[in-house]
Amino acid sequence: MAERTFVAIKPDGVQRGLVGEILGRFERKGFKLVGLKQITPSRALAEEHYGVHKERPFFAGLVGFITSGPVVAMVWEGDGVIASARKLIGATKPLESEPGTIRGDLAVNIGRNVIHGSDAPETAEFEIGLWFQPSELNDWSPSDQAWRVED
């Protein structure tokens, strides 16, 4: 199985109508969407997702923000998808993100940076398991697979 990563369009990205733009960037890169849903996260889900930041001063604000509205949760699959997604997304701080990245082009500030992406294989596995049931992920092969990826 190819590598998988978790990506979430945060409430600011959903409210600003950026879902199609962001999905398109991942599709044009050649990654395969295997899981997709819109959900307003519960406080418990948000606290577990951001648990590594629990002792940080911004934790409460982060949890409050991510639970403030709908999030588009996605699982993308492809060779090197974790590292590639991080490059597509850009730096956490939008002012440090390169033009052409999602945050460089679309994000306003660190508190409203539009998108989240897993940063490592272990994180991706944890986040996918947290946000998706196995039955919500679809194994499928695009008809143009041979034109995108070398065997």
Curated annotation (Swiss-Prot):
Any single biological process term in GO: CTP biosynthetic process
Q: Name one GO cellular component term.
A: cytoplasm
Q: In which pathway does it act?
A: Purine metabolism
Pfam families according to UniProt:
NDK
Provide the protein name: Nucleoside diphosphate kinase
Q: What does this protein do?
A: Major role in the synthesis of nucleoside triphosphates other than ATP. The ATP gamma phosphate is transferred to the NDP beta phosphate via a ping-pong mechanism, using a phosphorylated active-site intermediate.
Annotated ATP binding sites: 10, 58, 86, 92, 103, 113
The catalytic residues are 116 (pros-phosphohistidine intermediate)
Subunit details for this protein? Homotetramer.
Q: Which family does it belong to?
A: Belongs to the NDK family.
Report the main location listed first in the record: cytoplasm
Question: What is the species listed in this Swiss-Prot or TrEMBL entry?
Answer: Synechococcus sp. (strain CC9902)
